[in-house]
Each structure stands twice: as structure tokens, then as C-alpha cells.
């Protein structure tokens, strides 16, 4: 029997012994392992000068490799070549023969570009770049993101790398659209912080992509399920997200204020941290929601499923969401969700059900109407596609071969 080929995952998003950040990539790695077709190796970046070679988490060895980048994403792409060589060197140092590698799967632009260094050692390696965001060219972030020389450099650097990638993996059709049509503005997405940057690049030619596919972020249903679900007493609404402008917590709070004005009884738990948190607390106070809305900074990962199970409804009106694992995690625990139109999760909603579960962007009135409708009528939420990560990964690996 032939030895298994190696599947290398290169990602900035991965848990450590101290943090579960990036657990969705961890879940995907475990699903590939359970599938059994490949031997999986994980590479995570470290700062240059860091002497660590790796760490172990839940019996999985994670290799570290030095990566170079300028602060605040300045001229992102300038060091793609340096990092590609650094990764290739780390792979060989880890005792992995490039001839045994079948797939190099980078998560986000810089890591897809780094994976190209392995293809230079073995041209038979299939290089994948997975896009987790509605900004697949990574032009939105950084203090000087809107400065045209920086913006243009970053976009062109990403395009050069992307045209060498064998397969672009997108977590939703919305992400795939933004990737394929860049720099065209997506008419379904109303987020000016991103759209104005696209307009600055309107003269740039489209990227000649070799191939794209959609792989939805799956759920580990051994953890996220309805076992032990309990909902009783006051109607409970929940939300988990970083407090950023794109998550639209203020729209959610205004919707809750309208529900209170209509005499509806409910309580809400909003979990997360971020720059918008204090402003949201102040808005909650102004709306006289102090007795109904609770803000929690953190929730240990091991308690996440229990949080979902005690909710009646999960609501996150984000207006720039590539997918949103929290929606399908909640659903797997028996809790339906309300999101916004035009986001990645909209793929999972049947078109005829959109009026139940997808609110207009930035619209507290529409959001409050949809929450009220669920409180009063409790319609069943159906999803168009599987959420189980083993099912999704098996189908993906079938296509990959």
C-alpha cells in the first residue's frame, strides 16, 4: 500500500495552548485527518528572532516558521518572496520531503503566496489559497490602507500571487464573487470602508484566476449539537462577535430598543470585546436597556455550545461577513439565527425563507420586525446545505483529487 501523501496547512489562524483563536482552521485540519487520505502538517508564522520551532496542541504538532511583514499591512506583498523561501526552508527542516507533498493550503493572501515556495521545490504540488473574508485582496486593514500608493501596491502584489495559485477556496459565494470580480464593487454589500477603496482601483484589470471553489466553514457536530439544550422562561437573544463597526452591534441594540417599546419581553447577552464596546454600552443605557442587555467580554471556548443551547435566537446583523461560523454553530445547537442580506451566510438560506432570516443592512426597523416575527410565530429554520465539517471536507477532498 502506497504511503499517504502530505497535506500542508499554512495559516495565521490556529489555536495555541493559551488561546483558541482560529479554531475553525483547527476543526478543518482535524476533519482532513479523520478523512484519512492525507498525512497533515501545520505551519504557523512566528516573528523573526523567535527561537521556538513549534508547539503541541491536543496531540497535534504545530511547526513555526519566521515571517516578515511591515507594520500595519504597509505595502503588504513586498515580502511574499522572502516568506515563501522561509516556509520552504522550515518544511525541509521539519523532515518533510517536498516530493511527498500533494497539497499546500495557505489561509489568506500572504500564506497562499508563501505556499508557492513549496511548488518551486516540487511542481506537482497543488497550491491552494483559502479566503476567509469579503476582502480577499487584504486591502481594507492598516492605518494607510486608503493611501493610493500603498493600496495599489497591495492589490497588484496579491494579483501576481493569485494568478499562480492552482485553486482559490472561498468560504461563501459572496467571497468568491469579490475575489473573481475585483476591483468591482459588489452591489449586495453596503460597507463604505471597503467600497471606497475598490473605487480607487477601478482601472485595475481583473485577476486571471486558474480555478475557484466554495468550501463552507463546517461545524464539529460532536461538540455543537442539541444535547442538553434548555430554553425556558424569558425569551433569550444572543450575539457573539468582536465589537467592530462592521458587526453592527448598534443596529442590534436599536432593534432591541424598538422591541422593548412594543412591550415585548426578552433579555440579551452580547459577548465580545473591541473598539465599539464602550460606545455600545452607552447606547444601551440611553435606550434604557440596562435591565435587559448583558455585556460579557469573554466566553471560554469549552462553554460556547452551552451558551448557544440556552438561547432562543442568535442575532448578528454584520454587514461585512464572509461566512460567520457562529451562525451555523448556533443552528447546530438548536438555535435559529438572523443575519443580514448580502453576507456569506445568505447562501444557506432558502430564497423563499429570506424574509424570515435576512434583514436589510443597517436597518434596525427591519431587524426588529424579524426578531418580533420569530418571537411570536417561531417558524422552523431550514438550511440549504450540510453544516457538519466531516461531510463538507469529504466532499471537498473528493473534488480536490
Residue ranges and their predicted role:
Residues 351-352, 356-364, 372-376:
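Conserved acidic donor-binding segment of nucleotide-sugar-dependent glycosyltransferases
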Residues 8, 169, 214, 230-247, ...:
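Conserved donor-binding/catalytic core segment of Leloir-type glycosyltransferases
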Amino acid at each position: 500500500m502506497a504511503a499517504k501523501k502530505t497535506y500542508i496547512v499554512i495559516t495565521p489562524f490556529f489555536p495555541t495552548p493559551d488561546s483558541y483563536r482560529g479554531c475553525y482552521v483547527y476543526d478543518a485540519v482535524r476533519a482532513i485527518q479523520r478523512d484519512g487520505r492525507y498525512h497533515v502538517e501545520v505551519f504557523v508564522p512566528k516573528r523573526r528572532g523567535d527561537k521556538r520551532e513549534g508547539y503541541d496542541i491536543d496531540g497535534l504538532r504545530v511547526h513555526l516558521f519566521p515571517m516578515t511583514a511591515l507594520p500595519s499591512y504597509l505595502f503588504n506583498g513586498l515580502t511574499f518572496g522572502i516568506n515563501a523561501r522561509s516556509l520552504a526552508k522550515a518544511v525541509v527542516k521539519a523532515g518533510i520531503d517536498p516530493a511527498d507533498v500533494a497539497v499546500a493550503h495557505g489561509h489568506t493572501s500572504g500564506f497562499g503566496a508563501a505556499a508557492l515556495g513549496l511548488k518551486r521545490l516540487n511542481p506537482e504540488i497543488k497550491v491552494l489559497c483559502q479566503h476567509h473574508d469579503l476582502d480577499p485582496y487584504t486591502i481594507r486593514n492598516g492605518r494607510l490602507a486608503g493611501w493610493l500608493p500603498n493600496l495599489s501596491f497591495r492589490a497588484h502584489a496579491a494579483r501576481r500571487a493569485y494568478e499562480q495559485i492552482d485553486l482559490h477556496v472561498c468560504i461563501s459565494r459572496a467571497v468568491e464573487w469579490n475575489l473573481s470580480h475585483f476591483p468591482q464593487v459588489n452591489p449586495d454589500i453596503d460597507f463604505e470602508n471597503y467600497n471606497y477603496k475598490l473605487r480607487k482601483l477601478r482601472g485595475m484589470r481583473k485577476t486571471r484566476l486558474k480555478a475557484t471553489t466554495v468550501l463552507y466553514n463546517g461545524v464539529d457536530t460532536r461538540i455543537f449539537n442539541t444535547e442538553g439544550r434548555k430554553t425556558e422562561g424569558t425569551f433569550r437573544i444572543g450575539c457573539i462577535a468582536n465589537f467592530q463597526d462592521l458587526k453592527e452591534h448598534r443596529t442590534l441594540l436599536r432593534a432591541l430598543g424598538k422591541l422593548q417599546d412594543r412591550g415585548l419581553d426578552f433579555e440579551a447577552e452580547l459577548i465580545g470585546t473591541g473598539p465599539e464596546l464602550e460606545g455600545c454600552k452607552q447606547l444601551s443605557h440611553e435606550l434604557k436597556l440596562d435591565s435587559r442587555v448583558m455585556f460579557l467580554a469573554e466566553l471560554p471556548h469549552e462553554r460556547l455550545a452551552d451558551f448557544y443551547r440556552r438561547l432562543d435566537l442568535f442575532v448578528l446583523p454584520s454587514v461585512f461577513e464572509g461566512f460567520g461560523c457562529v451562525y451555523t454553530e448556533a443552528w447546530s445547537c438548536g438555535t435559529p439565527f438572523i443575519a443580514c442580506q448580502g453576507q456569506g451566510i445568505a447562501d444557506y438560506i432558502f430564497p423563499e425563507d429570506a424574509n424570515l432570516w435576512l434583514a436589510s443592512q443597517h436597518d434596525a426597523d427591519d431587524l426588529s420586525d424579524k426578531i418580533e416575527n420569530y418571537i411570536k410565530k417561531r417558524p422552523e429554520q431550514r438550511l440549504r446545505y450540510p453544516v457538519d465539517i466531516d461531510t463538507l471536507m469529504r466532499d471537498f477532498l473528493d473534488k480536490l483529487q
